Amino acid sequence: MYKVVKFNEEDKYINDFLKLPKLIYSKKEIVQNESEERALLLSKHILSKYFVLHKFLVYKNSEVAARCVITIYEGDSSAYIGFFECIEDSLCAEKLFSEVKAFAIKNNYKKIVGPVDASFWLKYRMKVNKFEKRPYVSEPYNKNYYLDLFLQNKYKVCENYVSNMYGKFTPKNFQDEKIEKRYENFINKGYKITSPKKEDYDKVIHEIYRLITNLYSDFPIFKPLKEEDFVSLFKSYRYILDFSMVKLVYFKKETVGFFICLPDYKNFLYGKINLITLFRVFLNKRKSKNYVMLYVGVQRGHLGLGNAMIKPVVEKLKKRRATAIGAFIREGKVTESYVKKKIQSKYRYVLLELEL
C-alpha cells in the first residue's frame, strides 16, 4: 500500500515531488516556488554549494502522498527536514518519518530539526494557527494537521515565534509617546533615519548584508553566506520593495540599523507570472492595505533604536490607513512588544526537533 522512495535526479520523482503541493493546497493557500524547488533538487540553486540534499517520497496506491528533503551541512551534527508535505494520513507520515530517522541514525546525526527548507535564507518554521487567513507575503504556510503529524512521531517544539497583527493605523487613532520620544532622542543625538532610493539598491544591499550577518548569527539554524551569494539571492527585492517603507539608520557615517517593510503581496509572487499577477503586484506596491514588517536589525550598542526606526514607518501606515504584521519574532524578544497598543492578535509558528 505504501512505498518509500529515496531519489536523486530522476525526472519522474522530481515531477511527483513538485506536483504534491498542488494536490494538497488551494490556489489561495499554496506558497510553492516551483522553479526554486526544481533548482534545489537538481543542485543548480545559488545556495546548492552550501549543503547536500537527500530527497524522499512516499507513494500510496501508486500515487504520490508525502515528500520531504533532508539537508546536510558539512561539520553540523544536525540534519534538517524540510519541504515536508503529506496528505492527511498518519500512517503515510509515519512511513516517511521512519525512513528519515533511519537515514539520520545510520549517518550518525544527533538530531533532526525542522521544518527547514534547505536553508535559513529560504524558509523555515511551521505555522500552527490562523489557518482561516490567506498567507501573507513570505509566510511559511502549511496544513493545520502537520504539527500533529510531527508530534505523533516524537518531534518536540524547540523554538516559538510570533507575528503580531496590528489593527488599521489612521491619523487619529494612534499616538505612541514612547516611539515619539525615542525618535526625537536619537535624531537629537545625530542619528539619521532615511529611506534609500531604488537607484541606491546595489549599495544598500551590501550594507544590509553586513548587518544581517552580524545580528542574525545567533539565530537557530543560521548559516552564513558569502556576500555575492546574498546579493544574488535577494536581487528580486529591488522590484518588489516600496522603498519608502525601508529604513536605514546612520550614525557617525556607519550603518547601525535597518527596517524592511514589504507590501503584502499575499501569495501572488508564487507560481506563473501573468498580466493579472503583475497588475496586482503593481497595485500593492503603490499602496497596499497591509504591510509586513519582515526584517529589523540594530547594531549592538544602540539600545532603543528599534523603536525609533518604527516611528517614520508608523507615520506612513497612518497616512495610508493600512494594517500591518510584525513578522517572525522569536518569542520573548523585545521586538515582540513594538507598537504594543495596536496588537490585535498573533500568528504563531514553531521549530521542532527529534533527538536521536
Which functions belong to the PLM regions below?
Residues 4, 78-81, 193, 293, ...:
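Hydrophobic residues on conserved beta-strands that form the core of alpha/beta folds
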Residues 18-61, 66-76, 195-296:
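A conserved beta-strand-loop-helix scaffold within acyl/acetyltransferase catalytic domains
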Residues 76-154, 273-341:
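Acyl-donor binding region in acyl/amide transferases
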Residues 46, 71, 270, 340, ...:
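Alpha-helical subdomain
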Residues 2-5, 140-219:
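Acyltransferase donor/substrate-recognition loop-hinge adjacent to the catalytic core
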Residues 64, 120-122, 171, 255-257, ...:
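Flexible loop/turn segments at secondary-structure boundaries
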Residues 53, 159-163, 346-352:
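Short hydrophobic/aromatic beta-strand or adjacent loop that forms the aromatic wall/cage
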Residues 1-14, 18-19, 26:
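Generic start-of-chain signal for non-secretory N-termini
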